[in-house]
Amino acid sequence: MLESDFDAIAEICARVYPAETPYTHAELREHMTRFPQGQVVAEYAPAGSTNATVAGVHFTLRLMFKDFHIDDSWDVLTANDTFSDDNPQGHTLYGADIMVSPDHQHHGLAHALTDAARAIVMNEALRRMVGGSRLPGYGAVAARMSAEEYVAAVRTGTMIDPVLTAHLKDGWAVVRPIQGYLQHDPDSAGWAAVIQWVNPECPPPPELELH
């Protein structure tokens, strides 16, 4: 990520999360300062053109997950979006945010950005990557089933969630649903699913497993 990308990233954020305040230049600069190699940008250039534009981003930081609780919110895990809790000794890569411009969705960019983050896990010999998956399909059925029942149905394929199903197809595993992960997510009825991808070369020992 470069400072010249900041305006495009803020624009993508405004389009992907219209109810949220876009990232500021100061916040993006802080991310880049704390963990530069963990801020991944995907660019797109039309055929025959050298004028590439930002098409998607994946923001990550390293955490010592034993210092946190699995029910912690996005604000807690990102230190209110400052990434000041990035820990070079951390064994977990936390996927704080992944966004793809609506102009480039369904082109495989989210998968490519996830693969780039997994490469960071492998290259730095981290134990795993952890994230919080929105459950935008849950709000419509929350009155008749619990979040646990909904996530179980999505895992077995009997129900489809626009976000969690895509994560499962991309190799993530569900740990469990949690409440209050994001401040403003009415489509998910305030719920999210903790998901993880374990490094097959150095998986976490039993005392570091998430439950």
Language-model segments: which ranges?
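C-terminal/domain-terminus segments
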Residues: 2, 112-120, 124, 175-211
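Active-site rim helix/loop that mediates acceptor-substrate recognition in acyltransferases
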Residues: 16-67, 72, 78-84
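Conserved acetyl-CoA-binding loop-helix of GNAT-fold acetyltransferases
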Residues: 100, 106-123, 129-131
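A short beta-loop-alpha structural element at the N-terminal edge
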Residues: 1-9
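Hydrophobic pocket/interface hotspot
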Residues: 9, 13, 167
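Conserved acyl-donor/pantetheine-binding loop and adjacent beta-alpha core of acyl/acetyltransferases
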Residues: 58-97, 115, 135-162, 168, ...
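Hydrophobic adenine-recognition pocket in adenosine-nucleotide-binding enzymes
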Residues: 1, 98-100
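Short amphipathic alpha-helices and their capping/turn segments at secondary-structure boundaries
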Residues: 44-46, 81-85, 114-126
